[in-house]
Amino acid sequence: MKQIRQLVRNNNKSIMGEDYIICQIYKESRFKQFAGKNKHNAKGLMQMQRNAVRQVFKYRQQKIKGRMTTDKETNEAFANADTFYKSDKIFDEKENIKIGTEYLQYWIDKEATIEEAYRTYRGTDEAYYSVIKPCAEKLAKDPDNIQILMEGIGR
């Protein structure tokens, strides 16, 4: 737990506290760095998918430029995102947490509530945030207790 907590502390790009991100990572991958490798489209600790990575790369450009990107800039951002997604960098724990939390922050910035942001982040899983929130609240009181994750989210 201490190692994942330190990784989250150093790489979280969202406004969400580290306990929320730790619970989210556990729910997504059970802390398995190579989750999804050669199995499906969701990859790494935060189970990032290609379109999510593309959205982050495009959003980065919008923030840098202070405006919407042109079609050419969007295509360049998508090409860079695809290169990242297809590389082993997607499985680097630090990079995966950075891009996953950037993606979460994108939705936090777009949606009216944190709950809606998590719902949009996850897609159709209505219960996603309702599982993460109570787990994170318990973990905040006992930060090194992995049992909280196992009981709150599952094995």
Could you describe each region identified by the protein language model?
Residues 29-42:
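Short amphipathic alpha-helical segments at helix boundaries and their inter-helical linkers
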